[in-house]
Design a protein with these regions (language model features):
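Conserved PLP-enzyme active-site core in the AAT-like
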Residues: 1-100, 109, 113-117, 206-228
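Conserved C-terminal alpha-helix-loop-beta "cap" of PLP-dependent enzymes
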Residues: 111-121, 125-227
């Protein structure tokens, strides 16, 4: 792209991708990258916020647009500064734990006869794990198992609902400490064929393993998985 026009500004949304690989997009020539602090780089500690990183020109332009020309990064909310720095410090370890959980989930469901993407031994670009089910009820019970194995609101039963912006009903499981924190263990899916669960996050490998095994237990008891 730069060979076509060196003045083109290349921007990437790196949500779910931070610390998954050894290098980040700006090390590969991207002018600017952005992401959410309630995802990977917040380490599960940040309650809100986002970040941008890149060339000085891009950051100055973005800061001027967000606040005011001349003020740039000298203003803005700093209420979570301690959590931001502590979360960033913990983020590589937390991302590693969620990746271990994703690999465990992929291998487990492959052995149970389901398809997963990425497969357990494939290179990963982010923390999202897909599991493909044969029926909508299997998908629903998996998400309910994820919720049941969560540290918050484990008593809640996720139900499909007509979420704005979607053509089909959507089920969401997220027993998280911070609402919407995708670095925490969660799963969601549109209730349509193909029946794909999008699972992501996990503050610890143990948390993911517990939630996934809880989901399997529910599916086994309902006759959706045969382990004989």
């Amino acid at each position: 792209v730069k060979g076509y026009n060196k003045n083109i500004i290349m921007f990437v949304d790196n949500c779910y991708g931070e610390f998954v690989k050894e290098q980040e997009p700006t090390q590969w020539g991207m002018d600017m990258a952005a992401g959410s602090l309630i995802k990977n780089p917040g380490g599960g500690l940040c309650k809100s916020g986002g970040y941008i990183v890149g060339t000085k020109e891009c950051i100055d332009n973005a800061s001027a647009r967000l606040y005011a020309p001349g003020l740039l990064k000298e203003v803005g909310a700093t209420s979570n500064k301690r959590l931001m720095f502590q979360g960033l410090y913990m983020a590589p370890y937390t991302v590693k734990e969620s990746l271990k959980g994703a690999v465990f989930t992929a291998l487990l469901f492959e052995k149970l006869g389901f398809k997963s993407y990425p497969k357990y031994d494939e290179l990963r670009e982010d923390i999202i794990q897909l599991v493909l089910f044969d029926k909508s009820e299997q998908l629903l019970q998996f998400c309910r198992g994820v919720q049941a194995g969560s540290p918050i609101d484990s008593h809640v039963t996720p139900c499909p609902w007509e979420m704005p912006g979607y053509d089909d009903k959507v089920v969401m499981a997220a027993g998280t400490f911070v609402q919407g924190a995708s670095i925490e263990f969660s799963a969601d899916a549109p209730m349509r064929d193909p029946y794909v669960a999008y699972m992501q996050g996990g503050l610890t490998y143990t948390q993911v393993k517990l939630g996934v095994l809880k989901a399997c237990d529910i599916m086994i008891k309902k006759g959706m998985i045969d382990i004989r």
